UniProtKB/Swiss-Prot annotation:
GO terms for biological process: 'de novo' cotranslational protein folding; cotranslational protein targeting to membrane; protein targeting to membrane; protein transport. The modification Phosphoserine is found at S93. Residues 111-120 have a biased composition (Low complexity). This is Nascent polypeptide-associated complex subunit alpha. It is found in: Cytoplasm; Nucleus. It comes from Saccharomyces cerevisiae (strain ATCC 204508 / S288c). Part of the nascent polypeptide-associated complex (NAC), consisting of EGD2 and either EGD1 or BTT1. NAC associates with ribosomes via EGD1 or BTT1, and with the CCR4-NOT complex. Disulfide bonds: none annotated. Its main location: cytoplasm.
């Protein structure tokens, strides 16, 4: 028996894994190359990670993953990444960041929401009533209900799309 060179990449399979691989060969599963990491998340947000897995796919779309599963602690990795970013100067430290109380943040969000609602209402008021022409009132109401826009905007969209309900609704819901 010859010796294994120092830099050789050798993996020793246990008996159960060897049997499983033989069965996979018989099932006709195809190996998917290029996958570096596989993670599984349970309901309680516990994460299992497999580094450098061997992944096989069946014809039905199911996957079989071989590798050593380890419990992954994401919060520790996040804290380490933040410390590294602060050390390199990419992210400011906690003392440099201006903090706001939750009440101030909610007040800012409320003011921004009121400003956008008022601006939209002013736009509709400035234009006045738009002539519906030969458009069906039921079509106009349907567009208003589906997109939560004003009647004037619904009429404009229907006119722009020659009375086509689907295209008018799609253009307003973007």
């Amino acid at each position: 028996m010859s010796a294994i060179p120092e830099n050789a990449n050798v993996t020793v399979l246990n008996k159960n894994e060897k049997k499983a691989r033989e069965l996979i060969g018989k099932l006709g599963l195809k190996q998917i190359p290029g996958i570096i990491r596989v993670t599984f998340r349970k309901k309680d947000n516990q994460i299992y990670a497999i580094e450098k897995p061997e992944v096989f796919r069946s014809a039905g779309g199911n996957y079989v993953v071989f590798g050593e599963a380890k419990v992954d602690n994401f919060t520790q990795k996040l804290a380490a990444a933040q410390q590294q970013a602060q050390a390199s100067g990419i992210m400011p430290s906690n003392e440099d960041v201006a903090t706001k109380s939750p009440e101030d943040i909610q007040a800012d969000m409320q003011a921004a929401a009121e400003g956008s609602v008022n601006a939209a209402a002013e736009e509709d008021d400035e234009e006045g009533e738009v002539d519906a022409g030969d458009l069906n009132k039921d079509d106009i109401e349907l567009v208003v209900q589906q997109t939560n826009v004003s009647k004037n905007q619904a009429i404009k969209a229907l006119k722009a799309h020659n009375g086509d309900l689907v295209n008018a609704i799609m253009s307003l819901s973007k």
